[in-house]
Design a protein with these regions (language model features):
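Small-residue-enriched transmembrane helix starts and helix-helix packing motifs
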Residues: 1-16, 93-105, 128-135
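Histidine-/acidic- and/or cysteine-rich, low-complexity loops and terminal segments associated
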Residues: 1-19, 91, 118, 178-188
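Structural signature of hydrophobic alpha-helical transmembrane segments
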Residues: 11-21, 65-74, 134-140
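Final/C-terminal transmembrane alpha-helix of multipass membrane proteins
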Residues: 27, 166-184
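Juxtamembrane transmembrane-helix termini in multi-pass membrane transport proteins
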Residues: 9-58
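Membrane interface segments of multi-pass transport proteins and intramembrane proteases
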Residues: 62-66, 86-90, 149-168
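Membrane-interface helix caps and helix-loop-helix hairpins in membrane proteins
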Residues: 57-68, 86-90, 114, 186-188
Length: 188
């Protein structure tokens, strides 16, 4: 059972249905270069710990938040990260705090999916939630590793200044996040 939930967590992140999560990771990580991989790993870990905490609290029905509201807040976290990228272009020390706060919101979003998955199951934190979250962390590390290496080599080509690349990618992601905000807000 452990390995099954580890796989589900891993592939849940890499699924096209989790595009909002992948775009969040993209704009969260794009400001880090290859030499800052340890800092990025800490940011991802803060995100995952917070994500895991809110996910567990929601799955165990300790907290309940309107799922439709959470679905609006998720793209809002993406938009805020894009705006942050436009303003600063480099990672800031408080990125780890923002990642943690945003992880709480994203975890609540995943909890709705998992509640459907766990219908009729006895929820055991160590057999279900822990491996699911480890799978999420592994997928995030894989995604961000590939991203950082691709961006590093793209930057070496000197086709465009890296700060402009950050702005262009952040702009496209910001537009998509605004579309999600409007669409999801209309569903509340």
């Amino acid at each position: 059972m452990f390995f099954e939930f580890l796989q589900q967590g891993f592939f849940h992140i890499l699924d096209i249905g989790a595009l909002d999560h992948l775009l969040f990771l993209l704009v969260l990580g794009i400001v880090y270069d290859l030499s800052q991989w340890k800092k990025l790993l800490w940011v991802l870990t803060a995100f995952t710990i917070a994500h895991s905490l809110s996910l567990a609290l929601s799955i165990l029905n300790i907290i309940n938040i309107n799922a439709k509201l959470v679905e609006v807040l998720i793209p809002l976290t993406i938009l805020i990260t894009c705006i942050e990228n436009f303003i600063y272009l480099t990672p800031k020390k408080y990125n780890i705090i923002l990642a943690g706060i945003f992880g709480l919101i994203h975890g609540l979003g995943f909890s709705n999916t998992l509640k459907e998955l766990f219908i009729g199951m006895d929820i055991n934190l160590f057999q279900t939630l822990l491996p699911f979250n480890i799978g999420i962390e592994l997928a995030q590390i894989l995604f961000m590793s590939i991203l950082i290496f691709l961006l590093h080599y793209f930057n070496k080509l000197k086709l465009i200044a890296y700060c402009n690349l950050v702005r262009i990618i952040s702009a496209f992601v910001a537009v998509q996040s605004m579309v999600w905000i409007v669409t999801r807000f209309n569903n509340i």
